[in-house]
Amino acid sequence: MTPYVAVIQFPGSNCEYETARVLSHFGCNPKIIRWNEPDLLQDASGYVLPGGFSFQDRVRSGVMASHLPIMSQLSAGIKSGKPSIGICNGCQILAESGLLSESNHDQIDLGMAKNMSGHTSIGFVCDWVYVRPVHPEKSPLLRYFTPNDVLPIATSHAEGRFVLNHVLEARLSDTPHWMYCDERGQSGDFPITPNGGAVAGITAYSGRVLGIMPHPERAIFDWQLPWHFKHRTWTASWEKLIVAFRELL
């Protein structure tokens, strides 16, 4: 059987086809797997959890999907070393499953909270922002980036603020992750941070798993960028993430 990447389609996913298209463009072999086909994950060489609104974001974004039977198979694959990326709702599902904090459902050390500006809830935010990598050299998925890279990216969520317990907070400085920033790589408040938190994405399992709230699949090609980004020279492209992912399969 030809190795393939499982793009997991949950009830309410809406980015699985564009994500699969990007993976295919860069030499991966994506296969969209429904949430009720857990046995098909066993033969996959890697996983991508796409964006969307699984189960209409009822109760809490990602929490209902995180309890589906397919997550047991996904967890086993991740713990065996298979590379995995969760984007937006996929990131929320990984967080609710304990797969971004290497814990379990009984001890969730990392959660995704509602978007805030100061003490005010700001609801759903759909915009273009900038991010930069921290310690990319420590993650196989981020290894082609440098700490000086600044990348534009689309964001589209209402509950995207990373909340870490004290143990993970203390480890964050040594953990490969993505930070929101301005076009010069400097941190700041809203709207530089679209949800009130500085972290845009975080890695786990020796950097082979990435959960990221913004959408790299929407910022891969020049034609996807807003007009005011197109005439700038960027030091990096999200292609580097997909290529690194492909090489880990």
Each language-model region and where it sits:
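N-terminal beta1-alpha1 cap of cysteine-dependent amidohydrolase-like domains
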Residues: M1-I87, C91-E102, K114-V125, G196, ...
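Amide-donor transfer/coupling interface in amidating biosynthetic enzymes
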Residues: D43, A76-K79, L110-L249
